[in-house]
Structures are given as structure tokens and as C-alpha cells.
Amino acid sequence: MGLRFSTASGYLFSVDNHLSESALEVRNAIKAELKDFLAAQRGYLTSIADELIPVCDALDEYLLDGGKRLRPLFGYAGFLSTGKIPGKNDVRALSSLELLQACALIHDDLMDGSDTRRGKPSIHRQFETLHSKNSLAGAPAQFGQAAAVLLGDLALVWSDQMLHQSGISTESLTAALSIHDEMRVELMAGQYLDVREAGEKVHDVKRSLRIARFKSGKYTIERPLHLGAVIAEPNPNRHAPLLHALSAYGLPLGEAFQLRDDLLGIFGDPATTGKPAGDDLREGKRTVLIAMALEKTSSSGRSELMKHLGASDLTSAQVENLRHIITESGAVAEVEKLINQLADESNSAAHNDVIHEKARPFLLALAESATKRSY
């Protein structure tokens, strides 16, 4: 039987061995907080100008109609790791991570030139279409790109605002802001390294792993865990050992999560991922998977990969050929092996006695979900 948690605010959460049940309750609470926050922001923006209604509509859809909510879920797990139970204000603070993620994805799609996100047009494509429908002057593509920069920036501002206005204690907010700042810096650093890697002539597995750690590992899992933990226990003398234990769990899991993402970016089912088949190949992503394939394949395979990697007009047949080269190189099997090794390391770390036992089933279920997902 799962553990039942209740708070004065009326939230009921379950933590048991079934992520689908317990995570759904937390996800619903996160969505409710985001919905309330976005409604308030809509009122403010539309009081400025009616032309901002499409901005509100786009961000509402982006934040409320999809997403795995992984970062707030890991934040929730970090809170539980102290042995305490999150209340409404705590959930609101953790929900701010979804706004930071929206900023990251909107800007990432713009930098990659991605046409879709979760099976729908990416933000810059949506506003490119809006420009055309309204017969505005200038270039539709440039308008869409400018809008995406601004909507991403707005989501970043809102993330900070939602955290500040969450209602958590002053001590918890001070501790949380330190983690929040580090997380944002690490995200931007990882993103820059990812962009720069595309220009490197020699591809290196170690460099790609470093990017995976900062762009995803720390930002997606380790720092959200830390954020939840320090909101629950802001005293550094008390939370320092826990943060260390959560890092031992979160860092390998974050890298495994990104490696799974690398595989899905090339081999994922478009109906499930919401992205075209082989999208990472067209975008020229220099992932760990690609770096391994370039190291392991034959000279002819390497030439073929380098010739077509980053070609936006790749045909389905060419995508299938590149998939074959990558698979035959042994890189797919090697990445799967590495994912399993990292997941085992993470699962072992979850059993550290510093982590409260009520968080353990949730952590283990999240780890399985992060590494065995299909989207």
C-alpha cells in the first residue's frame, strides 16, 4: 500500500512503487499551480495590449498541454528525501521549474531550427504563421525567430517570479535561489558547449559526455533534487550530506537520461516523440551516440556520416542508411550498455541511508521512467 500524504492545503499525494499513480497526482498539482499562475499573467499582459493574447495562448498551450514534468517531480523527490512532506507553497515553488524548461526548449528549438515540439509547430514556427496570417510587413521567419526569443525570455522571467512569489519561507527561498542560479548558469553553459560542439572538426566522446552532464544531467535531475531538498531543509549544516547523496544518485541518472534522449532523437517513433524521424541527424546534433559512431565505424561509414550529418533535406532513405551505419558501428549497443551502467549506479546511490526511506520508491520509479522512456 502506498504512503498517503495530506496537507492543510488539501493536497493528497501517494508515494509507492508505481510511478504512474503517484506521479500523476503530483503532475496534476503542478499543472494546477501553473494554470493559476498563467491566468494571473494573462490578465496582466492583456491589460497592456490585445496583441499579446497570442503570446498568452502559445505559452498556455506549451505549458499546460504537454510535458513530462520531470524537473518538478525530481524536486518533489528531493523534498521527500528530507523526510518532510511538500505543501501547496512548496509545490508552487517547484512548479517554477516548468517555466525554466519552457525557456530552454523554446530557445533550443530556435537554435536547432526544429519545426515541431511534442507533435505541434515549435514556437518560432507558430509566430511565423501568425505573421503571414495577419499580413504583417517584413519577413515571417525573422518575426517568428524574434518572437521565440522573447517568449523564451518571458518564460525565464516568469520562472523567477513564480519562485519568488511561491510563499515559501524566507530561509527556504534564500537557499533555493542559490541552487536556482547555479542551475540556470549550468544550463546556459551546457547549451553553449552544445552549440560550439557542432563546429568542432574532430568529435570527442568525452566532450559529448561533458555536454550531456551540464545540459541535461545537472539541470534535469541533480539541481531539481537539490532545490527540493533545500526548500524543505534550508539549513546548510543539515542539508549538506543529503545534497551530496542526491548528487550521487542524480548525476549518473541525468547522463543516462540524456543518452536515452540521444537514441530517441535518431531511432524514436515520431508518433511517440512528437519529432520527425531522425531529427537529430538533420539538425547535426553532436551527441555521445554520434561521437561513438564516428569513432567505431569504418572509414566509408565515417565519410557518409560526416557528409550527411546536419543536412536539413535528408530523405527517409538517407536517414535509414545513417541509422544502419550507426547501429552497425556498435555505438547503439555501447550507449545502451552505458545507460544501464549509469542507471545501476544511480539506483545503488538511492539506497544511501542519508536519503529518507519514504523517498526511495519514488526515486527508483523516477529512475526507471527516465532511462526506459520512449519519448
What residues fall within each predicted segment?
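Active-site alpha-helical segments that house and flank conserved acidic catalytic motifs
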Residues: 90-118, 178-188, 218, 226-229, ...
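Residue-level signal for inorganic ion chemistry
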Residues: 74, 159, 190, 290, ...
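C-terminal charged capping/lid subdomain of soluble metabolic enzymes
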Residues: 321-375
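All-alpha helical catalytic cores of prenyl diphosphate-utilizing isoprenoid enzymes
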Residues: 44-49, 62-71, 146-158, 164-267
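A glycine-biased, small/acidic residue-tolerant capping/turn segment at secondary-structure junctions
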Residues: 49, 260-273, 303-309, 320, ...
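Divalent-cation-assisted or electrostatically stabilized phosphate/pyrophosphate-binding catalytic cores
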Residues: 118-152, 201-218, 244, 270-296, ...
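Acidic/histidine metal-binding catalytic segments
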Residues: 89, 168-178, 185, 238-242, ...
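Conserved N-terminal diphosphate/IPP-binding helix and adjacent helical/loop segment
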Residues: 1-97, 102, 106-107, 111-141, ...
